[in-house]
A protein has these predicted regions:
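Active-site-proximal inter-transmembrane loops
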Residues: 143-150, 216-244, 251
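Non-catalytic, topology-defining segments of multipass membrane proteins
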Residues: 1-205, 209, 253-306
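Intrinsically disordered, low-complexity coil segments
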Residues: 174-186, 212-230
Length: 306
């Protein structure tokens, strides 16, 4: 059952509460200097980093923001839940801001992520520091707001990272999963806080590292889009293919950001496997004319300032 009865504006927690939580999350990462580290803790942190990146790249980004593939309502909720566990708020909130980013990308101050119109600090993280940015305008994502479970999860997204934090501590403290008992603090610091903060920074880097920076030895600009985006092959693995950002801005509805075989897009590879299993389907391809355009390209400089 879906509904259209949701109020147009979903209020978030207070800005003060958000700031306090953000400070705590980042300060907690300093715990790496005070807790023991086992190989199991480290590899679990690495694995959860990639799970978190996949959750927002495949879920919040390609599915909820751009509808680049289809899936069941059950798996849709699983994607939304995983995205909440990444610490990037609810998927409706994520999609409304990202759709606005594409609408005004690097051509208007309304693109809150653009380093062309705002400071690097504002484009990277500072844009979050207002009550307006934290609230969710459900009218900007009516296709998602018709699902009451997504609206609920969007409002109470913080409950799930909190539950994961508690579970992580209990597993580390009272079981030998990480190599010994008594590793609750280590597990929390590394597999929860460090893993989550790094995955968040990877998302923020798409705004400040791949917008408005001239092409260089690891950045290239295949398409002459109106925005100032580039691709960054060096970040392909850490961001699971999301770093082919100029490609994405040329055709944002595709299920893949690495348009060619040599552009490693691990998110798309996972989606392809899931499509073979019929968990997802109707992956939107890159149109042939766009592929041909890219093959003929010899690279482009950034557009002039608007």
């Amino acid at each position: 059952m879906t509904t259209d009865a949701s109020p147009p504006l979903q209020r978030a927690e207070s800005l003060r509460a958000f700031k306090i939580r953000a400070v705590i999350v980042h300060l907690a990462c300093l715990g790496v200097f005070f807790v023991p580290l086992t190989s199991t803790v480290l590899w679990t942190a690495v694995a959860l980093y990639f799970v978190r990146v996949f959750s927002w790249e495949a879920g919040s980004h390609r599915y909820f923001s751009h509808r680049s593939f289809k899936t069941s309502r059950t798996f849709q909720f699983i994607l939304a839940l995983l995205a909440a566990l990444s610490g990037q708020r609810g998927v409706i909130w994520w999609a409304t801001h990202h759709r606005a980013h594409h609408k005004y990308s690097d051509v208007s101050p309304l693109d809150q992520h653009s380093p062309r119109f705002h400071s690097l600090w504002h484009a990277h993280f500072g844009w979050l520091l207002s009550q307006r940015a934290l609230d969710t305008d459900l009218t900007q994502a009516r296709d998602l707001a018709r699902f009451p479970e997504l609206v609920w999860l969007n409002k109470y997204h913080y409950l799930f990272p909190l539950g994961l934090l508690i579970a992580t501590f209990c597993v580390g403290q009272y079981t030998a999963f990480f190599g010994a008992t008594g590793l609750g603090a280590s597990a929390v610091v590394w597999t929860f806080f460090v893993s989550m903060v790094l995955s968040q920074q990877a998302a923020f880097l798409l705004n400040t590292g791949l917008h408005g920076v001239e092409p260089g030895w690891f950045r290239y600009r295949r398409f002459a889009t109106q925005d100032a985006t580039t691709n960054a092959w060096l970040l392909a693995i850490p961001i699971l293919g999301g770093a082919f950002h100029n490609n994405h801005h040329r055709y944002m509805n595709s299920a893949r950001s690495g348009f060619y075989w040599y552009e490693l897009d691990l998110t798309y590879l996972v989606l392809k496997i899931l499509s073979w299993l019929r968990v997802v389907w109707d992956l939107v391809p890159v149109p042939q004319d766009v592929l041909d355009e890219g093959r003929k390209s010899k690279g482009h400089a950034l557009p002039g300032n608007p």
